[in-house]
Structures are given as structure tokens and as C-alpha cells.
Amino acid sequence: MSNRKYFGTDGIRGRVGDAPITPDFVLKLGWAAGKVLARHGSRKIIIGKDTRISGYMLESALEAGLAAAGLSALFTGPMPTPAVAYLTRTFRAEAGIVISASHNPFYDNGIKFFSIDGTKLPDAVEEAIEAEMEKEISCVYSAELGKASRIVDAAGRYIEFCKATFPNELSLSELKIVVDCANGATYHIAPNVLRELGANVIAIGCEPNGVNINAEVGATDVRALQARVLAEKADLGIAFDGDGDRVIMVDHEGNKVDGDQIMYIIAREGLRQGQLRGGAVGTLMSNMGLELALKQLGIPFARAKVGDRYVLEKMQEKGWRIGAENSGHVILLDKTTTGDGIVAGLQVLAAMARNHMSLHDLCSGMKMFPQILVNVRYTAGSGDPLEHESVKAVSAEVEAALGSRGRVLLRKSGTEPLIRVMVEGEDEAQVTEFAHRIADAVKAV
């Protein structure tokens, strides 16, 4: 059981200006992290950020804290989260820090860490950082203070890494692709990767101004992408979230292709190429259609708790190399160490190019069950709505009605005061009615 006070499932996150996302807290966080990480012998930390205006302020605070602890900061500028993981490994830095709130609005921000090998920090290290934060800040001797510098052509390094995950014998020259970068960290990366691999690229969501990240664009809102794909008669569309660790796709008919379908395509192609090792890891939210489709292919499937760190833990536990969330986090351990939207998207494009098949046709072997998700906001500290007898009773009624051909899942968000109500089954109208019935019970608590 974790005793972490500040760190959630994806680092520390909140509204800018409210605790804990304040300059003084982040400065002390940088100092505490520096004290803990310096014990391991390294004196440099990679710092990247997305395109939020608050990133400048938080970047400066982190730098000051790290310097006081005697560690130097290497800045990447706006850079996707998986790029920071990659650069942390290649620079042999003690850790990487990403300033981002991922898919959240611009007024939120957060801090998350990568270890020296490009994976999320273990709980024990996060707990050690929190323990250090209880102490008074002390500064190292002046001669031992950390410095700050910028990495030359960090974007170019990451672009070449992404391209190297795409087979040399294939090309994207026959594809017209609309790419939506959510006005986020991939805006100067993804279009260039696709163009350099030969694609005809139409870019949207590539004009960040500090306050428009994820605003009606990107992986969490694909309506603009769907409209543009149809208007341009493109072969497909690819959307990333604000920090580039999620990918959602759209086929030539405007149909959304989520993380479950993306993992199905990649796993099936890996099986065909004789490169799939073991099975695939999804989450409690993964569609039943994915589980059934993989079963038909003879590919083992396991569910982890929701959250990419838990998907990775389950992958490591089983020794498997592919895992995903339906939200678009896709982890391919044969390619990289964390969820990477661009790399995952490239593997789907490789399957299209190799088999001369459309994205729509690649998805045809998997029948998606209707899955309705309703988010219900609750007041933190007012008790657990999921433990209320009325909520349990309604959930039990719905589960009984669905039987073996459906599922009910209620869970708390790891980053916001939300209860997520998910109901899945074969009849969309019935599933929708059931989901709202449970959501109403949660609201009434």
C-alpha cells in the first residue's frame, strides 16, 4: 500500500496556483528530488515540458530547487513525454522530469519523473522525495551548485529515434494523413516524422499559444480531426494528446480507432511477423471485443488496473512486450520504455503499408462492444460514494441484467475527484440507460 501524499498515478497534478502546483512547492520539490537523486551519483536531470504557459514558471522553479541541491538541469523545451524518457536514457541522466498535465486543460499542470532507464519512478523513490520535502531547504556550497543548459536539437534527436522504429523497407508515400497535435508537445515533431517517411501530411492543432492545448483538438476530442479527414478525403487521421503519450486514430470514413483497436492491430501484425512474444495487457476499461478478438488469434490477454504505470507493471510481471489503455496509451517494450503516441501510430502505419490495407480493414477483425462511460464529480473528503449501499444495489441490478455478455466498472479517477461509471454490453441503448442509472445513484449520495 503506497503512503504517497503528493504523487498520484501519474506524478503530481493540479490547478496552477493552487497547492501543490505553486512555484514555492515546485521549487522545494526540485530540491527534494535533487537530494534523493544525487545520492545515486549523477549530477544532471533532463527537464521537458508541454506547451502550457505555466511551464515556464514551473521550469524555473524546478531549476532553482535542483541547483540548490547540487544538480544541473538540461532543458529540452517543449517535448513529448516519451521523448524525455528517451533523452533521459541516451544522456545517462539520473532522471527526467516532465512538466505537463497530459490531456487536461491549460490551467492545470503537473510534474512527473522518469528514472535513469526511462521508466516511471518506483513508489519507494517517490516516497523518499516526499519525506525529504518535510525538511527545511538547505543549499550546497556555492562551488557545488547546479547549472542550467539547453540540449542542442533535442527535437531532431527524437525525430530520428521515432523514424528508426519504422521498417526501412516500407514507405508512407501512398498515404495522405491528417495529424492533430492538440496544440501540444508533438506540434514540431509528429508532422516532420511522417513527412520524412514519405507521407502527404495535413497538420492541425499545431499552433500552440500557451492556453489552447487540448482545446477542442487532440486525442480527447477528435471531432475536428474527423471532419478534416472527410473534407480532405485523407486515408486516415492521427491525434495525440497534449504531451504525446496517447494516440487515437480515425479511418477514412471518419470512424474513431481507440487504444484497444490500435493494440489489436499491432498485436496481430506482430503475430503474423513472428515477432509477438507472449500476450497483450489491457486494463479494466479495455473493451470485451478486444479480449474476444485476441482470444480468436490465440493471443493471451490480461487486465491491469487503469493507469499506464499499472499496465507496465503487469507487462513486466508476465514478461510480455505490448500493453495499452483504450484511452490511447500504448506501450511497446520492444521499441521504447513508456507509452509513446508517435511510435505506436507508426506501427499501425507499418501494418497498413506492409499489407496494403486501409485502417478500416485492419480493424475489421475486432467487433467493439458498446461501452458507455459517464464521469460523476464528487466532493473530495466527503466519503466514498462507491461504498454507499444504494450505489452497490443499483450496480448489482445492472450486472444481473447484463449477465455474461456485459460488464459494470466503477472506479475513482487517479488524478481528479471523479467517479468513472463504465457499462459495457451488446445493446447500446440498454448500456446507455444502465450507465446513467448508476451515475444518478452516485450523484444522489
UniProtKB/Swiss-Prot annotation:
<feature type="binding site">
    <location>
        <position position="243"/>
    </location>
    <ligand>
        <name>Mg(2+)</name>
    </ligand>
</feature>
<feature type="modified residue" description="Phosphoserine">
    <location>
        <position position="102"/>
    </location>
</feature>
<dbReference type="GO" id="GO:0004615">
    <property type="term" value="F:phosphomannomutase activity"/>
</dbReference>
<keyword id="KW-0460">Magnesium</keyword>
<dbReference type="Pfam" id="PF02879">
    <property type="entry name" value="PGM_PMM_II"/>
</dbReference>
<dbReference type="InterPro" id="IPR050060">
    <property type="entry name" value="Phosphoglucosamine_mutase"/>
</dbReference>
<protein>
    <recommendedName>
        <fullName>Phosphoglucosamine mutase</fullName>
        <ecNumber>5.4.2.10</ecNumber>
    </recommendedName>
</protein>
<dbReference type="GO" id="GO:0009252">
    <property type="term" value="P:peptidoglycan biosynthetic process"/>
</dbReference>
<dbReference type="GO" id="GO:0008966">
    <property type="term" value="F:phosphoglucosamine mutase activity"/>
</dbReference>
<dbReference type="Pfam" id="PF02878">
    <property type="entry name" value="PGM_PMM_I"/>
</dbReference>
<dbReference type="GO" id="GO:0005975">
    <property type="term" value="P:carbohydrate metabolic process"/>
</dbReference>
<feature type="binding site" description="via phosphate group">
    <location>
        <position position="102"/>
    </location>
    <ligand>
        <name>Mg(2+)</name>
    </ligand>
</feature>
<dbReference type="Pfam" id="PF00408">
    <property type="entry name" value="PGM_PMM_IV"/>
</dbReference>
<keyword id="KW-0479">Metal-binding</keyword>
<dbReference type="InterPro" id="IPR016055">
    <property type="entry name" value="A-D-PHexomutase_a/b/a-I/II/III"/>
</dbReference>
<keyword id="KW-0413">Isomerase</keyword>
<comment type="similarity">
    <text>Belongs to the phosphohexose mutase family.</text>
</comment>
<dbReference type="GO" id="GO:0006048">
    <property type="term" value="P:UDP-N-acetylglucosamine biosynthetic process"/>
</dbReference>
<dbReference type="GO" id="GO:0005829">
    <property type="term" value="C:cytosol"/>
</dbReference>
<dbReference type="InterPro" id="IPR006352">
    <property type="entry name" value="GlmM_bact"/>
</dbReference>
<feature type="active site" description="Phosphoserine intermediate">
    <location>
        <position position="102"/>
    </location>
</feature>
<feature type="binding site">
    <location>
        <position position="245"/>
    </location>
    <ligand>
        <name>Mg(2+)</name>
    </ligand>
</feature>
<dbReference type="InterPro" id="IPR005843">
    <property type="entry name" value="A-D-PHexomutase_C"/>
</dbReference>
<dbReference type="InterPro" id="IPR036900">
    <property type="entry name" value="A-D-PHexomutase_C_sf"/>
</dbReference>
<dbReference type="Pfam" id="PF02880">
    <property type="entry name" value="PGM_PMM_III"/>
</dbReference>
<dbReference type="InterPro" id="IPR005844">
    <property type="entry name" value="A-D-PHexomutase_a/b/a-I"/>
</dbReference>
<dbReference type="InterPro" id="IPR005845">
    <property type="entry name" value="A-D-PHexomutase_a/b/a-II"/>
</dbReference>
<feature type="binding site">
    <location>
        <position position="241"/>
    </location>
    <ligand>
        <name>Mg(2+)</name>
    </ligand>
</feature>
<comment type="function">
    <text>Catalyzes the conversion of glucosamine-6-phosphate to glucosamine-1-phosphate.</text>
</comment>
<dbReference type="GO" id="GO:0000287">
    <property type="term" value="F:magnesium ion binding"/>
</dbReference>
<dbReference type="InterPro" id="IPR005846">
    <property type="entry name" value="A-D-PHexomutase_a/b/a-III"/>
</dbReference>
<dbReference type="InterPro" id="IPR005841">
    <property type="entry name" value="Alpha-D-phosphohexomutase_SF"/>
</dbReference>
<dbReference type="InterPro" id="IPR016066">
    <property type="entry name" value="A-D-PHexomutase_CS"/>
</dbReference>
<keyword id="KW-0597">Phosphoprotein</keyword>
